[in-house]
Amino acid sequence: MKFFIAFACLLAVALANEDANVLRAEQQVNVDGFAYAVELDNSVNVQQKGDLNGEEWVVKGSQSWTSPENVPVSIQYIADANGYQVVSANPPLPTPPPIPEAIQRSLEYIAAHPPSQ
């Protein structure tokens, strides 16, 4: 299954720009981990490595490309039991807006009064 996901990601990157040519494509699939890397001639670089840590996967990766405005973009991330987390991004990712006060109060009420069955 993880091979299919990695292959689908590689295919999506390759088809995103039909004029791009693959300069490098590497993949390694093991029982306890996987790794792949793709480099295209249009500045797109994608790398990902996953390791089985006990019962859970820990996936680390990076992506980089040049935007249509000719600005270099890069993202490094980790995905584990805590979810997807951006480790670094250039340019920085936008900060999400604060949670509205009414919604925050509702969340606090729900946490204080869990549903009973």
UniProtKB/Swiss-Prot annotation:
GO cellular component: chitin-based extracellular matrix
Every Chitin-binding type R&R domain range: 31-97
Signal peptide bounds: 1-16
Residue stretches in coiled coil: none
This protein's record includes keyword Signal: yes
GO MF annotation list: structural constituent of chitin-based larval cuticle
Keywords associated with the record: Cuticle, Signal
Pfam families: Chitin_bind_4 (PF00379)
Any GO BP: chitin-based cuticle development
Job of this protein: Component of the larval cuticle.
Protein name: Cuticular protein 47Eg
